[in-house]
A protein has these predicted regions:
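N-terminal pre-domain/capping segments
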Residues: 1-106, 176, 180, 197, ...
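Acidic/histidine-rich catalytic cores of soluble enzymes
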Residues: 6, 128, 135-232
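Active-site beta-loop-alpha junctions enriched in small/polar residues
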Residues: 10-14, 38-42, 75-78, 118-120, ...
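Active-site groove signature of glycoside hydrolases
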Residues: 108-124
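An active-site-proximal structural segment forming one wall of the substrate-binding cleft
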Residues: 87-108, 112, 133-147
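Aromatic/hydrophobic pocket-lining residues that form the small-molecule binding cavity
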Residues: 20, 56, 94, 98, ...
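Hydrophobic faces of well-ordered beta-strands that scaffold small-molecule active sites
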Residues: 5-11, 35-37, 70-75, 113-115, ...
Length: 281
């Protein structure tokens, strides 16, 4: 029977000490269809973009052995190295990370790359930072067009791009078939509560531009490490809207915070979200 949707697991939900084989095996065991790999701000993860052929081969062998693909990639390193940073050296590093991440995605069979919607993370957003951000995002779209990889803006925590509507503006300015939006259910919920607008109306502004959805729990003003179904995200309502807008790829975003039963949390995230997704399917 044809699957109606796919659900992926955020890599950082698992213990960092696990091998690729163990991570992929864990995701499969907990009921996922794919894994989302992370290129985060740590040197260890950023260095993945310089992987040699043998290392890539090892990952691909793990993928085939587990029977579970790496379906997407989150490039959160672009917080520390922001695309709109006033420092030219930081912007160059950001562009290197972006380009090499997209090239790595090609080599690993990853088709969707998520970039954070920040012009600058550490520092003040200005006309200048917004200008640099747009310039570099246009370059990223050209790289994505060349490599055939879909890139999506993640809606983030701060005012610059914390709603789908704001992401749409940049997608329209760049106007590329390969640059779309990868919203975060938790972040757009927090923005909706703070700014008193309807989260599903905001999500609907992205119609035709949504490539996947991060399913993440939040509380007002708290954006990370909130256990599933203990916060204020209306998953049923958001999934229902996302489904009606054609979203068929979902990733549960949660973190290993050192708990002994971290694996149970992953299985719970899968089961609770699949229950809602299966109602749509």
């Amino acid at each position: 029977m044809m699957k109606k949707y796919e659900i992926g697991l955020y890599e950082k939900a698992m213990r960092n000490t696990l091998s690729w084989s163990e991570k992929l095996g864990c995701a499969k065991e907990c009921g996922y269809d794919y894994m989302e790999m992370c290129i985060d701000v740590t040197d260890e993860k950023i260095n993945r973009i310089f992987m040699n052929t043998a290392e890539k081969k090892e990952i691909m062998e793990a993928v085939f052995q587990a029977g579970l693909p790496i379906g997407s990639m989150s490039v959160s390193a672009l917080t520390k190295y922001a695309l709109g940073d006033p420092d030219e050296e930081i912007r160059k590093k950001a562009m290197q990370i972006a380009e090499k991440s997209i090239e790595l995605a090609v080599d690993l069979g990853v088709r969707t790359v998520m970039i954070p919607g920040y012009d600058i993370y550490f520092g003040e957003s200005t006309i200048e930072t917004k200008k640099y951000f747009l310039e570099n995002v246009k370059k990223i779209a050209e790289i994505a067009e060349r490599e055939g990889i879909l890139v999506g803006f993640e809606t983030m925590e701060n005012n610059f791009m914390n709603t789908t509507g704001k992401a749409v503006q940049y997608v329209n300015m760049v106007d590329s078939a390969y640059l779309k939006i990868y919203p975060d259910a938790g972040n757009i919920t927090n923005a909706a509560v703070e700014n008193q607008h309807d989260v599903c109306e905001d999500l609907s502004l992205g119609k035709g531009k949504l490539i996947a959805l991060h399913l993440k729990e939040t509380k007002p003003g708290i954006f990370r490490e909130v256990p599933f179904l203990t916060g204020h995200v209306q998953f049923e309502k958001i999934i229902n809207t996302a489904w009606s807008l054609g979203v068929r790829r979902y990733v549960t975003e949660l973190w290993d915070v050192g708990k002994e039963n971290w694996k149970e949390d992953i299985c719970f995230a899968n089961q609770s979200m699949r229950t809602l997704l299966d109602r749509e399917a």
